[in-house]
Amino acid sequence: MRRITLSALLLVGASLIAGDAAKDLPKFSGSDYQKYWTDACSRCHGANGSGRDNSGKPLPDNGFDFTDSRKANKKKDSDWVKITLEGKDKMPAFKDKMAPADVEKMIPIMRKFAAK
């Protein structure tokens, strides 16, 4: 019973942390999608999409590794839009930060990491 309670508390805590992380992210405006990746997405996914910093160390909230083409290419564009807008696991929701059409325009940036 203790394990279940502790697990539930950890899950709730992780959800709250992910929610708080989203508050610090800038709202998208304009049309510079690469700049938004750099300003917001790279905080967790890294500048190169790997979830690691330039020295190769995992980022504190290392997100999905877009350079893992086996995993990244399994996802449909609609999956990426849904995950980005609604959030998943450690990924905060961006529905208050970006319009669905803007998320769709970010997908080529996400996909280019798996192509390398």
Please report, for each region that a protein language model flagged, where it lies by residue.
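Electrostatic cytochrome c docking/interface patches
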Residues: L16-Y36
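Gly/Gly-Pro-rich "capping" loops immediately C-terminal to redox-active cysteine motifs
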Residues: N48-W80
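Solvent-exposed, polar/charged alpha-helical surfaces in well-ordered, non-transmembrane soluble domains
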Residues: S31-D39, S78, K82, E104, ...
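Periplasmic/extracellular electron-transfer cofactor-ligation site
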Residues: Q34-D61, K90, K112-K116
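Sec-dependent N-terminal signal peptides
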Residues: I4-G13
